[in-house]
Amino acid sequence: MSTFTAYLDDQDLIRIQKGEEHILPFYLKTNQGHLALIPVKTSSAATDTGDYFLSPIPLELGEEYTIYDATGNSSILHYRNIVRKPIFDQTFTYSGEDLGSFYTPRQTQFKFWAPISQDVSLHIEDQVYPMNRTENGGWEVLLKGDWEGAAYHYEFRVNGLERRIHDPYALSSLANSGDSLVIDRKKITRPIRRATRQLDPTEAIIYEMSVRDFSVQKEAGFKHPGKFKGLTESPQLNSEVLGFDYLQKLGITHVQLLPVYDFGSVDEEDQWKAYNWGYDPVQYNVPEGSYASDPNDPYARILELQDTIDTYHRANLSVIMDVVYNHVYQADEYAFEQIVPGYFYRYNAEGERTNGTFCGNDVASERSMVRQYIKQSLKQWVSLYGFDGFRFDLMGILDIQTMTEIAEELREIYPNIYLYGEGWKMDTGLSEDQLAHQYNAKRLPAFGFFSDNFRDTIKRTLVAGHRRESQHSANDFANILTANVGKLGPAHFTQPQQAIQYVECHDNATVFDYFQLEKEEIRLEDRKALSRLALHLVLLAQGVPFIHAGQEFYRTKGLEDNTYNLPDSLNQLDWTSLPKCQEEIAFLEELIAYRKSQPLLRLKKGQEIRDYCDVKWLSDHHLIYTIEKDREKITILVNIGDQEQTYQHPSDSQLLFAYPHANLQVPIPKGKELSIPAHSWLLLHETKSAK
């Protein structure tokens, strides 16, 4: 029985954690049976389990070793800190993109990266095939015959323990992250039909929604509730069009889907037992089975997602995928943790996993095989499914080099791809200058960032009913309306496409609920007016507007702040609200159409904003926001207070928007006094005569 445990912490450093009894010296035995004495370099007896540090000659990484003491007690030499040393990546970076299973009717090739494993075998359809070690930690086996649809997994020994995992490079699996399935890639490879008009990022209007929330409401009458197929349905309710046709009518340009990869916590064979948004990744390259018609069919989840995206493309709607490469679900059980313990995550100086994500683990994107895995995964989602962009959850956890390479390699596949994410600064064990957070935006010109400055300023100021921030601060209305590019405050972003302007998303309370939570005695009409104003400002600001599904018809989640695992009754889109909100929706459709037709509302360059935009407070309760270029001028008057405000317009103009009226084209003569209702805004347009 072993009285100590041995760890390989560097190529020439073994650490012995000894038990109550130990007898020197120590010996190292290779799996070929060779025995060598290892001298003690230093020892520590500060505790009852003091350590010995041994200095063997540099070991051949990947082999299995055993350490003995003088009485024959032994311990497998565990690969520990060595897996996070540069020598490990230098030795075991596998550069090929052929990991996984590759099928033809005559044979299927299986390749698996497991650099410190022994006795690796493929288990397929109740048969076992030993795999052969190749270069850089790879293993492979070639099976003759037709294996299409076959279920398989890998078994191996690592650090003395037997392991069994699915294939982390697989494209399909049995339900609930079960065995991987052999796929004929020819059956899932198709021409990608993109939206006809390719847009600049500032022309995008993003609409965030969940596959499940979109179609689960019983009263709405979807035939495939909670499924990929439900995303393309257009039922009617009281003659009002719902679903897919509603999205087209609204006029948005992009939909952002909450996670659609295989995630944990929802039973794919009985999805109604539990609800989850899906921010708990299990298989990054496999679509979520609970959204498929049959989670055990090798092709259903793949083809149904492909068909959905193609349908959106045919309707000139682009599709963005919400991806979560910053942490995994159940870190100890995750495939790469089973393959190379301690490699896939970041650790602090005490040898504990960092937890910047607050999910128990932070993915170490800077490590060679992790970086390669993330890039390959993203490229498959673009080339096989046709995704038009990615929203990176907790992007500030990921490193700049990885994100830069992602942008470069994805643009080689699809030049117009749009990339953005949550750029929060988080403590994750890497220096801040290495991380892809919003304060490093200048080094990440290819990425957009959710603007918490915009979100918080709009919501808090509207609750207060008066100006809150000092002039030229990062959170002043003047700065956030101009995309924080430095016109009227600190330059947070370099270009407007980096500013994702939003006040509501799946996280936190909806705006409609927020105003109730902040002002318990608020009247319903004021709650609605503030919610409308917040949404409209998203579309009037420079940058990229982002709308949470249902926000336009006062989405509520029962005043809950975090509904990631709460019932469908709270998370579902309430389509029955549509008939009651026709005035609001019709106005929003007109505002969206106007933004799409008016280049001044979506300037493409930071310098243009600095040259053409201005924002001034007329009082503590209302402001004027102007965009003037050449002979054209837009004037937007915003009243954040609960009392009517007035403004005397200095030139001849046309009043275009005054809620609930749009496209008014009402002449406004010079000097006319305008009334701006509480919690509302006006938009005027003028074209100056040529000199």
Give names to the regions the model predicted.
Residues 112, 154, 209, 257, ...:
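Conserved, mostly hydrophobic/aromatic
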Residues 26-28, 110-112, 117-126, 644-661:
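Beta-strand-rich binding/interaction modules
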Residues 174-183, 407-408, 412-554, 559-560, ...:
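Conserved alpha/beta catalytic core and glycan-binding cleft of carbohydrate-active enzymes
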Residues 212-385, 405-414:
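Substrate-binding/active-site clefts of carbohydrate-active enzymes
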Residues 2-10, 45-105, 130-230:
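The feature marks proteins involved in alpha-glucan
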Residues 149-150, 668-691:
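C-terminal beta-strand-rich structural cap/linker in extracellular carbohydrate-active enzymes
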Residues 543, 547-560, 570-634, 643:
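Glycan-recognition and catalytic regions of carbohydrate-active enzymes
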Residues 2-3, 104-111, 116-118, 614-650:
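Carbohydrate-binding surface patches
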